[in-house]
Amino acid sequence: MAHIVTLNTPSREDWLTQLADVVTDPDELLRLLNIDAEEKLLAGRSAKKLFALRVPRSFIDRMEKGNPDDPLLRQVLTSQDEFVIAPGFSTDPLEEQHSVVPGLLHKYHNRALLLVKGGCAVNCRYCFRRHFPYAENQGNKRNWQTALEYVAAHPELDEMIFSGGDPLMAKDHELDWLLTQLEAIPHIKRLRIHSRLPIVIPARITEALVECFARSTLQILLVNHINHANEVDETFRQAMAKLRRVGVTLLNQSVLLRDVNDNAQTLANLSNALFDAGVMPYYLHVLDKVQGAAHFMVSDDEARQIMRELLTLVSGYLVPKLAREIGGEPSKTPLDLQLRQQ
């Protein structure tokens, strides 16, 4: 439960303006970054037909101009590698395409996951839901009401997870309505929101949203999705400070990505940047084996070695848990770092 605080924050219109100011063409993205369109980069153009390219200019501003290997760019730029059909990779790696009701997944005993909205501010090329049938699980009040009725009928649930897409694509008044409905269900104690929007467009943390969280009787956790320290800037730190003041618990989960953050020093820099922003590292996921993203894969042995090195670089509280999600399993599966074998 949080306390009401009045804050000066960006207007609702500001984040919506930034949300609409996006680049959807690979050639334009490369031009903005002063990157010569080499043959390899041009070959990836048609991958936008597999999964649309979408990058807000506010996120592009944090990319290094002239660097085709920029870690933020690599997360969003189409690639010819997306056409590779890799063994063991599928369109539904987590076996999520069977909702208990439209838009609601009950994969874990005490938690249910609501797909609040299908869209995202940015399309990340490694997204494990890039093939998800959002058309069959639309985020609207009718489906939300059906989902809430299911939640109310299942007293084993004590935590709701808002996901997507990105749940913060919902307008402030929609989120306020959802929180009010959840607060009326006695067995729901916590709300966990997984979102990339606060890092992509920090202005999403509006005064109305902060006050909505401040009023809530639920324990609210925000799990940011941030993969590299270069994503973190002053506007993000200010947004997180506003949420901390009203009692929101701030966490982060990352994905271990080839040529983005697959070394210990990069992850140490990320953990330090997160902590400076008041955010605790939570999980580091090995890649979900979604079709079209095999080029981001880091092997388990490499991941363990990176984590063993990370342990020597930062304090223990800055080391995220290395884990993978396996479809059908009742929880995430931690990866043993095999420290005793070293």
UniProtKB/Swiss-Prot annotation:
<keyword id="KW-0004">4Fe-4S</keyword>
<protein>
    <recommendedName>
        <fullName>L-lysine 2,3-aminomutase</fullName>
        <ecNumber>5.4.3.-</ecNumber>
    </recommendedName>
</protein>
<keyword id="KW-0413">Isomerase</keyword>
<feature type="modified residue" description="N6-(pyridoxal phosphate)lysine">
    <location>
        <position position="332"/>
    </location>
</feature>
<dbReference type="GO" id="GO:0016869">
    <property type="term" value="F:intramolecular aminotransferase activity"/>
</dbReference>
<keyword id="KW-0479">Metal-binding</keyword>
<keyword id="KW-0411">Iron-sulfur</keyword>
<comment type="function">
    <text>With EpmA is involved in the beta-lysylation step of the post-translational modification of translation elongation factor P (EF-P) on 'Lys-34'. EpmB appears to act before EpmA. Displays lysine 2,3-aminomutase activity, producing (R)-beta-lysine from (S)-alpha-lysine (L-lysine). Cannot use (S)-ornithine or (R)-alpha-lysine as a substrate.</text>
</comment>
<feature type="domain" description="Radical SAM core">
    <location>
        <begin position="106"/>
        <end position="329"/>
    </location>
</feature>
<keyword id="KW-0949">S-adenosyl-L-methionine</keyword>
<dbReference type="InterPro" id="IPR007197">
    <property type="entry name" value="rSAM"/>
</dbReference>
<dbReference type="InterPro" id="IPR003739">
    <property type="entry name" value="Lys_aminomutase/Glu_NH3_mut"/>
</dbReference>
<feature type="binding site">
    <location>
        <position position="120"/>
    </location>
    <ligand>
        <name>[4Fe-4S] cluster</name>
    </ligand>
</feature>
<dbReference type="Pfam" id="PF13353">
    <property type="entry name" value="Fer4_12"/>
</dbReference>
<dbReference type="InterPro" id="IPR022462">
    <property type="entry name" value="EpmB"/>
</dbReference>
<dbReference type="InterPro" id="IPR013785">
    <property type="entry name" value="Aldolase_TIM"/>
</dbReference>
<dbReference type="GO" id="GO:0046872">
    <property type="term" value="F:metal ion binding"/>
</dbReference>
<keyword id="KW-0408">Iron</keyword>
<keyword id="KW-0663">Pyridoxal phosphate</keyword>
<feature type="binding site">
    <location>
        <position position="127"/>
    </location>
    <ligand>
        <name>[4Fe-4S] cluster</name>
    </ligand>
</feature>
<comment type="similarity">
    <text>Belongs to the radical SAM superfamily. KamA family.</text>
</comment>
<dbReference type="GO" id="GO:0051539">
    <property type="term" value="F:4 iron, 4 sulfur cluster binding"/>
</dbReference>
<dbReference type="Pfam" id="PF04055">
    <property type="entry name" value="Radical_SAM"/>
</dbReference>
<feature type="binding site">
    <location>
        <position position="124"/>
    </location>
    <ligand>
        <name>[4Fe-4S] cluster</name>
    </ligand>
</feature>
